[in-house]
Amino acid sequence: MKRLFLVFLLCTTLAACTGVPLRSLPRLMQLPGQLLDANPADFMVALQVDARFVPPPGAVPMLAIELTPRDPAAFQAVNKKLPLQLAVASAATLGLEAPPLGRRWLIYSLPAATQTELQRIQATVRQAKANPSYKSGGNLGVGVEQGSLAETAPALANTRWETWLQTQKADGFFEVWSGTPAQLQQLARKDK
């Protein structure tokens, strides 16, 4: 029992330190597989931010996909950062609840060119899986880079920032990260 408690405490601490809600961990673990089967038109990232926040010109989150075969002959490795496009909402929309007073949603989806690129990546994986000689598998990493968006006025640096994700319209959005723009910038600097 003591060991179970320590594991729970460790998981809780880890999630709290990174800003990832514990309830999201099971869905995040399924994300790579879901992305390979997802309709690219359904994929969206929603940010709930202070209503005064204005994204820097040209700054958009990127869908980062890294796909590496164990056997380099199986298929060509993929390392792509696909740009998303913006829509703004101050009311309930797309299954998201209305933001509290003083906040708004920035909703990012895949533009047509990015949808086509994601479909190409999905086809590459399906083709590799269908190939009888493909037995070795590979690694798939999926993330959403949003550090460029966090460049904000100092007055907003410590306001709440929530990141929500949808891979399939039927499943809706789920929260994947919460913190502040300052924390987001700090994470982006660590990744460089």
Predicted features and spans:
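Residue-level recognition of well-ordered beta-strand positions that form the cores
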Residues: 46-48, 64-66, 139-145
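Structured domain cores in non-transmembrane regions
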Residues: 55-134
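C-terminal motif of bacterial Sec signal peptides marking the signal peptidase cleavage site
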Residues: 13-16
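Short amphipathic, basic-aromatic surface patches that mediate peripheral association
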Residues: 48-54
